[in-house]
């Protein structure tokens, strides 16, 4: 059975991600795992026994608090069937804890809440951006302010370097929840483009799903992310899909950044990111 992993820090900021994950798990008939990663500092003077007892007490209290918190979310979104698995994992690094668990248990998607980040946060990174840049598993980022609505329209922004394979992954997410798919390629002025009707017919044959194709011309008065933001305002999708290249050299990442990571800082709609497969 497919597994959806959603993270929580037991704060109101994680409500949006948990709400979306609950709905997705029901729609996709997936197993829902809610994960809390924690790290306890051990005082030097404590014995092994004392620290073990403290850890047990902490875990029991946290499980009770999270159980009440999660059941409250089920009630808020009017999901009568409460069905999830709660996991607590100890790890000094939250991102490593999430990825280790997700890989070990073959999770299909990781769902996480995200907030806007200030300058210092951008400099040192956030859990969301670190997950996006390092996860081999697709990451669904839900803005903490997101009001729960159906994920029924996916806008896939493509650079057209591997769109056939990437589109299959997008459709694999969209099909079980009945979401429409639009593939958008922001084209350079001198770029050759296929006829829209022919491209849509070809893609429908390749992925066995209806795909709308948009090819707006690149406007160099805007950054690429600003153009994507403009497209979001124009076409009103419920999910933006981006593919991020984890194999890019570190210097290139520092200079140019990642569109997916950049969007996670200020995006107003859910963002689904996949690891871009590098052609050999």
Describe the predicted segments one by one.
Residues 112-114, 138-144, 270-275:
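Short beta-strand elements of ligand-binding domains
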Residues 112-130, 242-266, 280:
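Glycine-rich, Arg-bearing micro-motifs that act as flexible, cationic patches
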Residues 123-126, 138-144, 148, 160-171:
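Active-site glycine-rich loop that binds ribose-phosphate moieties when present
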Residues 86-97, 221-225:
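Charged docking surfaces used in two-component/phosphorelay signaling
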Residues 101-108, 233-237:
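Glycine-rich phosphate-binding loop signature in dinucleotide/nucleotide-binding domains
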């Amino acid at each position: 059975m497919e597994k959806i992993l959603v993270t929580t820090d037991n704060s109101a900021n994680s409500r949006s991600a948990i709400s979306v994950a609950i709905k997705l798990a029901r729609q996709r008939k997936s197993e829902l795992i809610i994960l809390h990663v924690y790290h306890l500092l051990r005082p030097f003077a404590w014995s092994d026994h004392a620290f073990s007892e403290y850890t047990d007490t902490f875990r029991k209290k946290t499980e009770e608090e999270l159980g009440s918190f999660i059941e409250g979310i089920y009630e808020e979104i009017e999901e009568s069937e409460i069905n999830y698995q709660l996991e607590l994992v100890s790890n000094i690094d939250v991102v490593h804890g999430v990825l280790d668990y997700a890989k070990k248990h073959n999770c299909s998607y990781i769902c996480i809440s995200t907030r806007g980040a200030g300058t210092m946060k951008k400099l040192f990174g956030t859990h969301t951006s670190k997950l996006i840049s390092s996860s081999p598993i697709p990451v669904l980022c839900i803005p903490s302010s997101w009001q729960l609505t159906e994920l029924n329209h996916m806008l896939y922004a493509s650079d057209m370097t591997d769109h056939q394979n990437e589109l299959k992954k997008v459709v694999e997410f969209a099909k079980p929840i009945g979401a429409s798919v639009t593939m958008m390629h922001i084209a350079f002025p001198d770029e050759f483009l296929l006829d829209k009707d022919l491209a849509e017919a070809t893609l429908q044959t390749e992925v066995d799903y209806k795909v709308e194709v948009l090819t707006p011309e690149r406007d160099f008065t805007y950054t690429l992310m600003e153009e994507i933001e403009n497209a979001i305002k124009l076409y009103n999708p419920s999910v933006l899909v981006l593919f991020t290249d984890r194999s890019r050299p570190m210097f290139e990442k520092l200079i140019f950044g990642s569109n997916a990571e950049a969007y996670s800082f200020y995006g107003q709609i859910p963002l689904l990111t996949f690891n871009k497969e590098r052609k050999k």
